[in-house]
Amino acid sequence: MMLKPSIDTLLDKVPSKYSLVILEAKRAHELEAGAPATQGFKSEKSTLRALEEIESGNVTIHPDPEGKREAVRRRIEEEKRRKEEEEKKIKEQIAKEKEDGEKI
């Protein structure tokens, strides 16, 4: 049974088998969690879809993993601050509406 994509083709895209396994697993988890696909797929399973993306060159290993982690942390913190500000505005609006209602 011939597997598609072949291991040889995939190893042309990453430096080692270890890197391939890690990249494939991480991307498969992302796809399972609802990350947008970079292409149409032939396969049904997320692991094989991840391998298809690696083969096509749409998914690669980040050259600066610590930089990527920091960018993700910043994005999460920014999203958290935005949500907190939004909640604060909603609470202020509710308080204002209550106050206006009591004046009538």
From Swiss-Prot:
Gene Ontology MF terms in the entry: DNA binding; DNA-directed RNA polymerase activity
Coiled-coil regions, chain positions: none
Region annotation Disordered: where it falls in the sequence: 53-104
Classification via SUPFAM superfamilies: RPB6/omega subunit-like (SSF63562)
Catalytic reaction annotation: RNA(n) + a ribonucleoside 5'-triphosphate = RNA(n+1) + diphosphate
Assigned EC number: 2.7.7.6
Gene3D superfamilies, per the entry: 3.90.940.10
Highest taxon of source: Bacteria
UniProt KW keywords: DNA-directed RNA polymerase, Nucleotidyltransferase, Transcription, Transferase
A family per Pfam: RNA_pol_Rpb6
A GO-annotated cellular component: DNA-directed RNA polymerase complex
BP GO terms, sorted: DNA-templated transcription
Annotated Basic and acidic residues bias: 63-104
Family the UniProt entry places it in: Belongs to the RNA polymerase subunit omega family.
Quaternary structure and interacting proteins, as annotated: The RNAP catalytic core consists of 2 alpha, 1 beta, 1 beta' and 1 omega subunit. When a sigma factor is associated with the core the holoenzyme is formed, which can initiate transcription.
Function: Promotes RNA polymerase assembly. Latches the N- and C-terminal regions of the beta' subunit thereby facilitating its interaction with the beta and alpha subunits.
Protein name from the UniProt record: DNA-directed RNA polymerase subunit omega
Gene this chain is encoded by: rpoZ
